[in-house]
Amino acid sequence: MKPSLVLKMGQQLTMTPQLQQAIRLLQLSTLDLQQEIQEALESNPMLERQEDGEDFDNSDPMADNAENKPAAEVQDNSFQESTVSADNLEDGEWSERIPNELPVDTAWEDIYQTSASSLPSNDDDEWDFTTRTSAGESLQSHLLWQLNLAPMSDTDRLIAVTLIDSINGQGYLEDTLEEICAGFDPELDIELDEVEAVLHRIQQFEPAGVGARNLGECLLLQLRQLPATTPWMTEAKRLVTDFIDLLGSRDYSQLMRRMKIKEDELRQVIELVQSLNPRPGSQIESSEPEYVVPDVIVRKDSDRWLVELNQEAIPRLRVNPQYAGFVRRADTSADNTFMRNQLQEARWFIKSLQSRNETLMKVATQIVEHQRGFLDHGDEAMKPLVLHDIAEAVGMHESTISRVTTQKYMHTPRGIYELKYFFSSHVSTSEGGECSSTAIRAIIKKLVAAENQKKPLSDSKIAGLLEAQGIQVARRTVAKYRESLGIAPSSERKRLM
């Protein structure tokens, strides 16, 4: 084939750096956005914070934003949004025209409580390990701190350090004593009984139950630290030592027969065991709390739901008018070119923030419009909602809705929820309507809470009760919803009354 030159006309979509920035800011959480803003303030001298009460004579493109507009009202079938407008700082021949809109579319918890065991004492000066522990401290460091306060020989201290290294985050000894003993230098001539003796000393450390080799020993160690006058102490020790498997399987009739106690007595023994902590190490190695900052605040005024941005979450920015005034339009020096580029970047950054706020406001308002039943009555009134519904309502692509609802939170009178929480699939009803999966989960939770604990509801029975309410759900679907709620099967929910 003979080579030739051909002239064609075509269109190609190019994602500009400004568009990439707008998309990136849109998908950031509030905490990440605050960090992004701080980095922008540090790197761009043209950007600065706008303090409350300051008047910049329209020098700030964000001065006339949603903060100064009334909150969006959601009532009946109509709603109004707060709009955001921005004025350019100055119009120069060298500056690019900024568009008005940025196209951004592209099984133990059921038996035992996890709280720490309560050790009553009449001595007000008794040392309390909880007063010393701090967030982020590991269980090993806490045990080593106590080890340094205990008088021991050098050999015993070496054994103790090795044992502490073998204790996992839950407080249990992971390796057997034989394996630990075999790991020492033969020249030290350390015997198995020495290792076990040091382990018994570590088991006296706080938190109570640490260093146990199994669940029964963990509970027994905690029982031994309770006052001897504690009611049902003897029976509780026997229960965790000899019949822990029967307790786990909830074979209460077998427990009463083998322990030779009545049902009421067994219930009191189990209540004592339930006050213990099966994971003593979790008292120290608790995960750091995750903080969220709501992006949107929803409140009710009479019969109307009002939607507004959380203005305290994101600082207001403006272009520094003094630095902007130094930019000379005709000057082509390197310094002036740098300042001109920084000014343009500052304007685009502010514009991207403005676009993010507008999109977030539109989406949040539509969510509240669709889920007013939830706000008024709770989870059982949640309606089916998918991304396409909101995308169609606000005239945006589903990918944009997905970005703006990820890691964005709404503060409501019922609590703080991620925007994605309000989206759920639907299940058909016998009357031809639809019910959201969130509402079904709420109904299942309500049914289980009201069940007879001596005869808990099976998944099939729950499916039958839902069908009686006109909701057609298979037993396997009920099991899936139940597991997502952290509810154990009926065989594990059986209780002694």
Swiss-Prot record:
Residues 41-101 are annotated as: Disordered. Residues 386-405 bind DNA. Keywords: DNA-binding, DNA-directed RNA polymerase, Nucleotidyltransferase, Sigma factor, Transcription, Transcription regulation, Transferase. InterPro entries: RNA_pol_sigma_54, RNA_pol_sigma_54_core-bd, RNA_pol_sigma_54_DNA-bd, RpoN_core-bd_sf. Pfam families: Sigma54_AID (PF00309), Sigma54_CBD (PF04963), Sigma54_DBD (PF04552). GO terms for cellular component: DNA-directed RNA polymerase complex; protein-DNA complex. Residues 75-86 have a biased composition (Polar residues). PANTHER family: RNA POLYMERASE SIGMA-54 FACTOR. This is RNA polymerase sigma-54 factor. The lineage of its organism: Bacteria, Pseudomonadati, Pseudomonadota, Gammaproteobacteria, Pseudomonadales. The gene is rpoN.
